[in-house]
């Protein structure tokens, strides 16, 4: 009787903890929803650890094709800080795709117009936007590693067999059977088998733990797709994206089947759950999660392209939501106009990192040489034009009253440093940087919009003027 009372009390305690956890989670989500309405357009205050920020670029590194913004130009424009101000995302898929968007300008306006459709829909429909943001908040981030790091590491696991785990189950079943014939020996055997199973469990679990995190994220991806299908309003703007998600998720049924063995709801949501303690004891003894892990590993390897499609598509939608919210944070912005004629026309441009900027206007159909006294804002103006040129072909948003330009490939050489480790002096770094610009102009694709600040400042005046003259002639 005492055992029954004890078990009942323990069950009540577990239920109370579960109820408290569910209540806290619901309250936290309600608070999140309220803030998404009230704080729309308020700049994010997130702090990034170096390893977390570094991993954000990994989707881009995997998908960098065609013309991309190179590291020199990215650093010249201080784009890391601009990205942080723009990062209104809540999932790894969203923030990694937003980074990708900023580093890969569109070379035709068709994709930009499609992005504009999605951005505008979420700007004009607050309830739908918040519903999506709640879904992305549940999807969450992956910590200091990108999901693509985990997917890459899968190959390092090699082929894995479930035979040792089946053997552990057989030994456990035999020891339980012996209990019915010889209690003393059966208990001894059961203790030994459980000890062996626990030791072998933790040895293998230590190897696979990082990948369980990735599987949990894939599961949340599938859950997000399911929520989009059933709970979130569908729009014509997202018709193409919904079709991609439908096809990608349809092939992943084997991955989800029985996944609760490996991943409890707490593991998948990242929120934790008291029931996990009980489940962990079962996993230790029976190795059920290790068996399921190997099955899910096999499924993941077969469907890497489908997982990539889901990450890309879900990330794209959230990135567009973030761009819309970034627009709401701006004092003034415009939608860029793209023309076939050569030239650049912009009214009242301003820099995104300056709180009280001085706005400037530029209208030119040829090369421009900017002169002026020290600290007059020449470099800042160059960067302002360059950033808005990049914004026009990425987020379809310019910090200006009006912005008109053709489609460009944009490149710069501004904030260079000597490369001590590489053995290059400041002068050689400048020469190599300028050469990459000249090489780009000779490729014969879209026209190049280049920004050079203080050409060849690392050499003497006579050589600097002579070399600069020839460089400028080549860039005309």
Where are these regions (language model features)?
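Alpha-helical bundle segments enriched in helix-capping/polar residues
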Residues: 1-366
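ATPase nucleotide-binding head domains, primarily ABC-like/P-loop NTPase cores
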Residues: 323-326, 330-476
């Amino acid at each position: 009787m005492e055992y029954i009372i004890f078990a009942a009390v323990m069950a009540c305690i577990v239920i109370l903890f579960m109820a408290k956890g569910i209540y806290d989670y619901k309250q936290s989500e309600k608070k999140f929803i309220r803030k998404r309405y009230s704080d729309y357009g308020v700049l994010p205050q997130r702090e990034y650890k170096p390893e977390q920020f570094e991993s954000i670029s990994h989707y881009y590194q995997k998908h960098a094709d065609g013309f991309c913004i190179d590291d020199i130009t990215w650093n010249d424009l201080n784009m890391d800080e601009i990205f942080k101000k723009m990062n209104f995302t809540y999932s790894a898929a969203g923030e990694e795709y937003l980074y990708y968007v900023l580093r890969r300008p569109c070379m035709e306006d068709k994709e930009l117009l499609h992005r504009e459709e999605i951005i505008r829909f979420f700007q004009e429909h607050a309830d739908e936007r918040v519903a999506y943001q709640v879904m992305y908040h549940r999807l969450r981030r992956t910590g200091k590693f990108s999901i693509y790091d985990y997917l890459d590491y899968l190959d390092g696991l090699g082929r894995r067999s479930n035979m040792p785990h089946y053997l552990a189950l057989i030994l456990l079943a035999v020891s339980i059977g012996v209990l019915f014939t010889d209690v003393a020996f059966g208990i001894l055997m059961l203790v030994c088998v459980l000890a062996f199973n626990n030791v072998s469990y933790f040895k293998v679990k230590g190897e696979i733990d990082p990948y369980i995190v990735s599987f949990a994220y894939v599961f949340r991806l599938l859950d997000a797709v399911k929520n989009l299908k059933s709970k979130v309003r569908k729009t014509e703007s997202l018709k193409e994206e919904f079709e991609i998600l439908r096809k990608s998720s349809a092939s992943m049924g084997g991955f989800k089947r029985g996944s609760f063995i490996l991943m409890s709801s707490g593991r998948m949501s990242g929120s934790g759950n008291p029931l996990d303690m009980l489940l962990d004891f079962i996993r230790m003894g029976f190795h059920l999660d290790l068996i399921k892990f190997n099955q899910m590993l096999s499924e993941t390897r077969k469907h890497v392209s489908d997982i990539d499609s889901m990450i890309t598509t879900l990330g794209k939608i959230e990135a567009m939501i973030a761009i819309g919210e970034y627009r709401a944070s701006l004092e003034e912005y415009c939608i860029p106009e793209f023309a076939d004629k050569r030239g650049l026309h912009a009214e009242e441009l301003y820099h995104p990192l300056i709180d009280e900027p001085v706005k400037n206007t530029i209208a030119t159909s040829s090369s421009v040489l900017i002169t002026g006294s020290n600290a007059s804002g020449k470099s800042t103006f160059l960067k302002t034009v360059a950033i808005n040129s990049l914004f026009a072909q990425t987020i379809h948003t310019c910090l200006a009253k009006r912005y008109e330009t053709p489609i460009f490939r944009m490149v710069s050489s501004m904030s260079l440093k000597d490369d001590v480790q590489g053995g290059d002096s400041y002068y050689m770094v400048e020469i190599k940087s300028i050469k990459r610009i000249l090489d780009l102009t000779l490729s014969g694709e879209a026209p190049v919009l280049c920004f050079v600040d203080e050409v060849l400042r690392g050499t003497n005046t006579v050589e600097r003027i002579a070399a600069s003259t020839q460089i400028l002639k080549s860039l005309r």
